[in-house]
């Protein structure tokens, strides 16, 4: 059992170590080149901050996977699974490049979206595919020709959803770390090592990045930028497809939507609100969940912790729904944490209203 876990432990540890060591270097380069996120009325920070931290997350995750490959650990995968792992890795690289180009050159929204749809389509071609969905009162449905557009929408949609929640220090990295760990556990339970290997590396990189991106007593030293957020979002969406949806059961088909419910529901809510008001869905505003929590009187730090708890809660429900033996226990613990977080938020809002 321990021997079987070694590739995943090594992937996690290598990625975390590389991100921990390279982030200060990347930060210095970003400041020297002037690649910084400047304060504005829509943003929460007050001072310019380097915004290319995604470089270190990508380097750590990619290097960990390459080392695992050189050590021969991809040999545990059947050939189609190896294609899928490279499809997610290379697709993540291209999404990272799109975001990094946006960090440098401020690309138009429609141009970014077109490039993302093309890359997501290429990922579908190499086997990163949603082939089934579950419908109420119908059950599991084979998508057939609809597999391509639905997969492309999922991959590009989650990438943008993670980018949109990257509005408070540590938020996107922490949510991504929790989601990646949940996908790691479910993928191992469902015997999907390809997704588990990427999830292990991704979660390690995200947790190490929090060392510089989430400071309880002072502002973040560096932001991940669009490059990092797009990379995390695409990779999470990709591994949820190859690691969970590929297991053809009703439970497996709906698990990705539960695990990634926080960024997904936030994005859908904001898009429909903008369209309802006659606005472009690409126009930035302050309607995201983290904006609403802060506006209600919750501190930025507690808003982040609340969304962490929410992500952990839906993840625990996914573990319970997956059918694993301890799933009910995980869900109970996650629910208790969520209830406590709700009480803390309610208490802070109440104190603010009475002051």
Question: Regions from the language model: what does each represent?
Answer:
Residues 244-355:
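C-terminal membrane-associated helical module and adjoining short loops/tails
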Residues 1-267:
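"…together with the soluble PPM/PP2C metallo-phosphatase catalytic core" -> "…together
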